Regions:
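A short beta-strand motif characteristic of beta-propeller blades
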Residues: 23-31, 67-73, 110-117, 151-157, ...
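Beta-rich, blade/repeat-based domains predominating
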Residues: 31-44, 75-87, 118-133, 158-170, ...
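Conserved beta-propeller blade signature
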Residues: 47-49, 90-93, 133-136, 173-175, ...
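WD40 beta-propeller blade core
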Residues: 59, 102, 143-145, 184, ...
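Short loop/turn segments that connect beta-strands within beta-propeller blades
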Residues: 62-66, 104-109, 147-151, 187-191, ...
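Loop/turn-rich, solvent-exposed surfaces of beta-rich toroidal or solenoidal domains
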Residues: 204-230
Length: 286
């Protein structure tokens, strides 16, 4: 028995050494001025736009200081979960409380009636793709919908409760399939290309994600209180790094139900949702 315990003790450091560590360092945090922030995006003007769920609004931050600049459409976007910027300055907003994705010609129209939109029961995610099409995640029915202007182009089912829809550098689309604890990749024509659900990721509730210039996925696993960096180009995907220790908290390397992700070069912005703030992590480049 002593020999067995000794051998296990020898093995433990090797396991810990093989575990992926943090892929970025804590840099800055905003004041807790939000109300359950969800996904966020860098706008065409370089500012940071946050879907502030319980505020039913879009919060605008300076990405350099994480100071709040202004609130847009205050109280007009019930249960808002996502915001996406597309070609020519268009904006799509997943207005979850209205079960619709609203599309505006630009940010100045957020307080007015949308230019167009699509009905999407309990929509959690919206993507204005570089091809000009709108992809909406109708979580209530589990359908990923593709629309061009007002024309319905198709849908795929099987994603009940899914959240984000994000575009990779190669134009493919990634879905954070929350209830199924997986990530699913599609072509622009909604042909399924890949599924990432290997136990090594430890997914509990992947909500929102962004994709780096290298095609790596940065995933907020809300229920695990972690952020994962994943390389999807290898079989079954490779876990490159993790932020957070799996328990809720406040401070560097800690999150409480993180949801939103936005990547900008070597900077990573996250919605630290139950702490009602935005945090920034960075990779120092020599």
């Amino acid at each position: 028995m002593r020999l067995i315990i000794f051998l296990i003790a020898l093995a433990c450091p090797a396991v810990a050494q093989d575990a992926p560590g943090p892929f970025a360092s804590f840099d800055l945090a905003s004041e807790p001025v939000l109300a359950d922030p969800h996904d966020l995006a860098i706008g065409p003007d370089g500012r940071l736009y946050v879907a502030d769920k319980f505020g039913s609004r879009i919060a605008v931050f300076d990405p350099e200081t994480l100071q709040l600049i202004e609130m847009l459409a205050e109280g007009l976007l019930p249960g808002v979960h996502d915001i996406s910027f597309g070609p020519n300055g268009k904006v799509a907003v997943a207005v979850t409380g209205a079960s619709a994705v609203a599309v505006y010609d630009d940010l100045s129209g957020l307080s007015e009636a949308p230019t167009s939109g699509v009905s999407a029961p309990r929509t959690e995610g919206a993507l204005l793709h570089s091809n000009g099409d709108l992809y909406a995640m109708a979580s209530g029915t589990g359908a990923l919908i593709r629309v061009r202007d007002t024309e319905f182009l198709g849908a795929v089912d099987g994603h009940f409760g899914a959240h984000d829809v994000a575009e990779a550098p190669d134009g493919t689309i990634w879905v954070a399939d929350n209830n199924a604890r997986r990530l699913v990749q599609y072509s622009t024509d909604l042909e399924q290309l890949q599924v990432l659900n290997d136990p090594k990721f430890g997914f509990i509730g992947p909500r929102y994600l962004d994709v780096t210039a290298f095609g790596h996925l940065v995933v907020a696993d809300q229920d695990a209180h972690r952020i994962l960096l994943i390389d999807p180009s290898v079989p079954d995907g490779a876990l490159l790094g993790v932020l957070g220790d799996g328990s809720p908290g406040l401070g560097p390397g800690k999150f409480d139900d993180p949801e939103g992700v936005a990547v900008n070069g070597n900077r990573y912005f996250f919605s630290d949702s139950d702490n009602n703030r935005i945090v920034r992590y960075s990779v120092v480049l020599n």
